[in-house]
Amino acid sequence: MAEQDVENDLLDYDEEEEPQAPQESTPAPPKKDIKGSYVSIHSSGFRDFLLKPELLRAIVDCGFEHPSEVQHECIPQAILGMDVLCQAKSGMGKTAVFVLATLQQIEPVNGQVTVLVMCHTRELAFQISKEYERFSKYMPSVKVSVFFGGLSIKKDEEVLKKNCPHVVVGTPGRILALVRNRSFSLKNVKHFVLDECDKMLEQLDMRRDVQEIFRLTPHEKQCMMFSATLSKDIRPVCRKFMQDPMEVFVDDETKLTLHGLQQYYVKLKDSEKNRKLFDLLDVLEFNQVIIFVKSVQRCMALAQLLVEQNFPAIAIHRGMAQEERLSRYQQFKDFQRRILVATNLFGRGMDIERVNIVFNYDMPEDSDTYLHRVARAGRFGTKGLAITFVSDENDAKILNDVQDRFEVNVAELPEEIDISTYIEQSR
């Protein structure tokens, strides 16, 4: 595993297996072929925010027409430099809020990093950096870099020295390593962003790193934090980083269900899961599918089995070298493979626009993880299907917790499902 060769100071935190809560959705805006597919309740357009013309051009290229509710609530204040604490359900465009707000305010100065965005997994950091590249398409003077463990720190040092970015996205372990070896100066940071902030601040080792990095940035700066799940306990921790923040809780925590997502369970023995999965993959219509399992071993074995059964599957898990993970993520995102088998590593924040079915082959360990996993389907308010295998009493208990917490009824999978309920007919 590539991470293990790397010095201690390149700590990453995405290596827990079961306990990794899936990450909400950091949405990549829809591509042109699914134009305007955000659920939007506002008829105002992005022009009303008085954004730079370069940003508006990029927004049009991405196929956005109207801001989502969270964008409508946050962007006008965020572009004025106000601190923001935001919770909104998966797939509602939170990433675009901080990407647009920081690019609107940025005044690039050679050799100075002014925007720092941190998240808890490498894949999510990679994805956010791609969003910055997408939205800064017509801002050629703005340079964006992404830094995370598992790849050579020497390359990162070289980038900072010879082609210093204005926007840095990364994981706290690698960022702190670069700061400690004096490759990376935080003294010009004007915008400090945490995506999936609950995940970062709940883990004490990661929270310590975030706090150390935060203390090394200037006192006067904008601080923004976002997540799909923000418990009452973690909110005060977030507020300690902020000065009089605007707080936007678009959804009451109990109503974090996803519009357009059909959710079902199947009761079966562990030994019956493979046969049932193959049967369902045969009869269901899908664009792309993600199958979540609880361990690296199961991930590898199931992916192999699917390939042997002529299902074009690819696996992503924490045991892979970083380059391999990113390469596979890109293959799946580019639609080269239609079935992905993954551990929780992939659950939170990853955004693949064509996924319309998620299987919980193994039950997630809690209701947060359930939300973040199933949020991979039905992105941007499109239709989707989530099917959860329940094989013992503990599984049943977690499913009951999900139904109680999110006030949703997860029914037993019927013999037949109307295809129009889980797939966009126009696609």
UniProtKB/Swiss-Prot annotation:
Residues annotated with Phosphothreonine modification: T171
PTM-bearing positions, type N6-acetyllysine: K35
Annotated catalysed reactions: ATP + H2O = ADP + phosphate + H(+)
Phosphoserine PTM sites in chain numbering: S37, S426
Ligand binding (ATP): A88, K89, S90, G91, M92, G93, K94, T95
Any one GO cellular component localisation term in the record: nucleus
The EC number(s) this enzyme carries: 3.6.4.13
Entry-linked PANTHER family: ATP-DEPENDENT RNA HELICASE DBP3 (PTHR47958)
Assembly mode: Binds ALYREF/THOC4 and DDX39B/BAT1. Interacts with the apo-AREX complex component SARNP. Interacts with MX1. Interacts with MCM3AP isoform GANP. Interacts with ECD. Interacts with PHAX; this interaction stimulates PHAX RNA binding activity. (Microbial infection) Interacts with human cytomegalovirus/HHV-5 protein UL69.
Family listed: Belongs to the DEAD box helicase family. DECD subfamily.
Protein name per UniProt: ATP-dependent RNA helicase DDX39A
Source organism per UniProt: Homo sapiens
Lineage of source species: Eukaryota, Metazoa, Chordata, Craniata, Vertebrata
Gene: DDX39A
